Amino acid sequence: MRHVTLIQLFNHPITQKFVKRSGMAHAIACAFHAYKLSKKYNVNPDLATKAAFLHDIGHYTWYRNGKWDYNLYKQNDIHAIKGAERAHKLLIRLGEHPKSAKEIALAILLHTDSYLPQGELHLNPLQQVVALADEADEEPSGEHHYRTISDERARKMLAELDELVALALSQTT
């Protein structure tokens, strides 16, 4: 059973503020990639699409002399940490099951290793799907965060993805 849809997430003011700031078009593209990857890796598509959609909700833009500074961002990046907490609070507020909210938050926390010390990170399948979905939409120097999409188009795409997820879940139960 789905407690929260992508459209509900999209419509929330927190999502509007923070996901738009980090790139709504990128978030939606990642959610679609995650849906496809969830089938390949036998992962719950509801959790995968939500985690991919919210994976950059913790982004903060780093500026130097009034210009976006990608290197400064990379040096100081903790967006996955901030994003995991922000997404968890949002999901709980909207009525997501606590266990699902935790799984989604952990996938967001581990979708990138940009803030972790060097070493090998072992991800579970959901976490792998979210990381791969993000990588599938990356552009050099973070340009994927600056693609734009209208609210109307975003709602239409997320409604379509909500339908695909609901159908996939109905076929597994």
Regions found by a protein language model. Name each.
Residues 1-3, 18-46, 54, 96, ...:
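Divalent metal-dependent phosphate-bond-processing catalytic cores, especially two-metal-ion Mg2+/Mn2+ enzymes
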Residues 4-29, 64-71:
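Active-site flanking loop/helix segments enriched in acidic
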Residues 10-13, 108, 130:
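A generic structural signal for nonpolar/aromatic side chains embedded in well-ordered alpha-helices
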Residues 24, 28, 74-81, 102:
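Non-membrane alpha-helical structural segments and their capping/turn regions in soluble enzymes
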Residues 30, 37, 77-94:
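An active-site-proximal "capping" alpha-helix that borders the catalytic cofactor pocket
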Residues 46-67, 83, 105-113:
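His-Asp-centered metal-binding catalytic motifs of divalent-metal-dependent phosphohydrolases/nucleases
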Residues 61-77, 118:
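Metal-dependent catalytic cores of enzymes that make or break cyclic nucleotides
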